[in-house]
Amino acid sequence: MSIATTFGTANTSGTIKAMLLGCGELGKEVAIELQRYGIEVIGVDRYPNAPAMQIAHRFHVINMLDAKALKAVIELEKPDLVIPEIEAIATQTLVELEQQGLHVVPTANAAKLTMDREGIRRLAAETLAIPTSKYFFCDTLAEFEQAVTDIGIPCVVKPVMSSSGKGQSVIKSTQTIQQAWAYAQEGGRAGKGRVIVEAFIPFDYEITLLTISAVNGIHFCDPIGHRQEDGDYRESWQPQSMSAEVLHKAQAMSQRVVEALGGYGLFGVELFIRGDEVYFSEVSPRPHDTGLVTLISQDLSEFALHVRAILGLPISNIVQHGPSASAVILAEGTSTNIRYQGMAAALAPADTQLRLFGKPDIDGRRRLGVALARDNSVEQAVEKAKTVASHIKVLF
């Protein structure tokens, strides 16, 4: 990959242009960090006024699964960097354009492999022989029912391509098998299709290990613990307490996956921990939602680290500020005029912060912001973050 040695100014002929494919809350923070280096940011997403579009220099609204539309917008803008921030992208187009010289972050192959759960699971389990849960991929209800029989109950069901827990469920009895299939078909980002059935690992806890591949080597953030509900994270905290031996195993496993994917950038590696055993779950070649806690827990957030790495800049050290937590601000309703109250009360306690994402609308349940807190212990930080979040009243 080519590394920039000269940085220009946005909206001038000498600028470095970065195109964000996906303009949600994570993309918004990446855009902010890019602009700190004078990078010209072009946002692309499937709906207008997405969070990162609100601060990008300009934006385009397209269906990013449409290969023709994706190629057209890239050829129009001629970006120096293309930064996928979501999975639902025509990644084969990125692979083809990369072969013609386009710089995709971290690589087009990484984006393609992690676009769905099948590519990355087969890489980890079959190519790298990394421990994972037992799994089957299914295209039909008959295959699905056979997979559930072979794996046993309880088992976990997910669309091969989805995000934020959409379409995910745990089968706990034979009565819910068809319901789980139907829910997975509804929740896929690219519509109905293939699902993965996984054995349920009775893990002690799960972590996100933010792993950065930079010009000066591999770097790790302290492990992040998190609590899931309905397949989506509700709170995350850093550091997650774990033994030095298990942490070393987790880091070694994460490094193998990241190096196999290639390129520079930050990767969110999800792992299950049971006793002294570590199991690979998933990886995203970009900042991770549970890593929002790093906005308050570290001197360099996951977004700052991602941008440093993709620009070819070195990472010298990462300072962790102590027990920290995030708690999501979740709302349910229908509105195109979302407003908020309770900000003053929310931010009254010491060592607290708030991020409202700027989502333009809501139709159902949606994550609209995140509360951040530091305290003397992880447990106290989690409770403080939850209290901060509880003060925010969403008006529709």
From Swiss-Prot:
Enzyme Commission number(s) of this protein: 6.3.1.21
Signal peptide start-end: none
Alphabetical list of InterPro entries matching this protein: ATP-grasp, ATP-grasp_carboxylate-amine, ATP_grasp_subdomain_1, PreATP-grasp_dom_sf, PurT, PurT/PurK_preATP-grasp, PurT_C, Rudment_hybrid_motif
Cellular component GO terms held in the UniProt record: cytosol
Alphabetized GO MF terms: ATP binding; magnesium ion binding; phosphoribosylglycinamide formyltransferase 2 activity; phosphoribosylglycinamide formyltransferase activity
A Pfam family assignment: ATP-grasp
Subunit structure: Homodimer.
Functional summary from the UniProt entry: Involved in the de novo purine biosynthesis. Catalyzes the transfer of formate to 5-phospho-ribosyl-glycinamide (GAR), producing 5-phospho-ribosyl-N-formylglycinamide (FGAR). Formate is provided by PurU via hydrolysis of 10-formyl-tetrahydrofolate.
Family, similarity comment: Belongs to the PurK/PurT family.
Protein name (record): Formate-dependent phosphoribosylglycinamide formyltransferase
Source organism (scientific name): Shewanella frigidimarina (strain NCIMB 400)
Gene of this entry: purT
